[in-house]
């Protein structure tokens, strides 16, 4: 593991990219003043071109069609405990294509260790405010299908996920991550504000209010390719950015121009991991020297 070494690669100075407003509760989610009406349509979307706009949605949405748009809506999500890992918006179906998730507030009324924010492939997520879910965004191609994930995540605000000590998938409680990438090609993560923080679901965890990671890259589903992580704000977590090769011999990621806070979990003696790369020899991470501490931008 070379996390301690990588911590020294977060530089100081002013980045070259044009100024972008940092996503927050005030500039993401349902636009101020937008009137919402209760959504009464199907929760499983099978009609291409369906538009859900300005709705209060009670229930988890399953997308099984092309060119679906969900915008300007408050997703209260389901009231049940899902039978397996899913999301308030589930885009795991092989029939999903060009899903647009724009300017939504995604905060479940009943959080669950199986309920993420948006999960799957073939989607664009912009200006969403996501909180109290298990993971914020889950990204991977369809197992056994195309190698392409085709996901763009931009301008989202993700924070305060829900930690559970009881988690059927992990003996040590939920591994909450703001964004988890498990495989696939063509992934862009840009201009997001991802805070790796948690609130207690059934009690505090080992790491207090720190999640697993703000962003974790682990190839559990497929090899990752053409993945760019650019100009985001990352903070908190056991490590703010974690990169693992997992099931494949190596992992390749571009990680550039990102802004890091200094509030990661302290493992002792001031040992913190803004960026943690589990294997230097099995990882190709370009752009490391272009990442900055947020408090040293000027």
Pin down the residues of each PLM region.
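N-terminal segments that cap or nucleate solenoid repeat domains
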Residues: 19-76
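Charge-rich, low-complexity terminal tails
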Residues: 13-16, 138-143, 151
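Short, solvent-exposed coil/turn segments
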Residues: 38, 45, 63, 99, ...
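Right-handed parallel beta-helix
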Residues: 49-56, 67-77, 95-109, 120-134, ...
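Acidic, glycine- and Ser/Thr-rich low-complexity intrinsically disordered tracts
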Residues: 19-37, 248-298
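Extracellular beta-strand/beta-solenoid scaffold signature
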Residues: 37-40, 57-59, 77-93, 108-117, ...
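Hydrophobic aliphatic residue packing
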Residues: 45, 61-63, 89, 101, ...
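Secretory targeting and sorting signals
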Residues: 1-18
């Amino acid at each position: 593991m070379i996390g301690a070494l990588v911590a020294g690669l977060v530089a100081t100075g002013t980045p070259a990219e044009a100024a972008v407003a940092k996503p927050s509760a005030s500039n993401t989610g349902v636009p101020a003043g937008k009137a919402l009406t209760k959504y009464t349509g199907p929760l499983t979307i099978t009609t291409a071109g369906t538009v859900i706009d300005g709705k209060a949605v009670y229930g988890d949405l399953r997308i099984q069609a092309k060119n679906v748009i969900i915008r300007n809506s408050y997703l209260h999500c389901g009231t049940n405990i899902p039978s397996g890992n899913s999301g308030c918006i589930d885009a795991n179906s092989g029939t999903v294509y060009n899903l647009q998730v724009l300017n939504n507030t995604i905060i479940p009324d009943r959080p669950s260790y199986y309920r993420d924010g948006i999960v799957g492939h073939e989607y664009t997520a912009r200006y969403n405010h996501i909180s109290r879910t298990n993971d914020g965004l889950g990204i991977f191609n369809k197992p056994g299908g195309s190698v392409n994930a085709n996901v763009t995540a931009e301008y989202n605000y993700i924070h305060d996920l829900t930690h559970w000590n009881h988690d059927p998938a992990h003996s040590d409680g939920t591994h909450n991550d703001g964004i988890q990438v498990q495989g696939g090609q063509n992934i862009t993560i840009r201009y997001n504000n991802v805070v790796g923080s948690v609130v207690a679901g059934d009690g505090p965890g080992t790491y207090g209010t720190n999640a697993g990671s703000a962003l974790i890259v682990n190839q559990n589903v497929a090899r990752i390719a053409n993945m760019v992580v650019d100009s985001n704000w990352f903070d908190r977590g056991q490590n703010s950015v974690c990169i693992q090769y997992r099931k494949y011999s190596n992992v390749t990621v571009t990680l550039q121009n990102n802004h890091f806070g200094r509030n990661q979990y302290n493992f002792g003696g001031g040992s913190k991991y803004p960026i943690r790369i589990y294997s230097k020899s099995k990882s190709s991470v370009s752009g490391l020297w272009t990442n900055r501490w947020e408090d040293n931008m000027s």
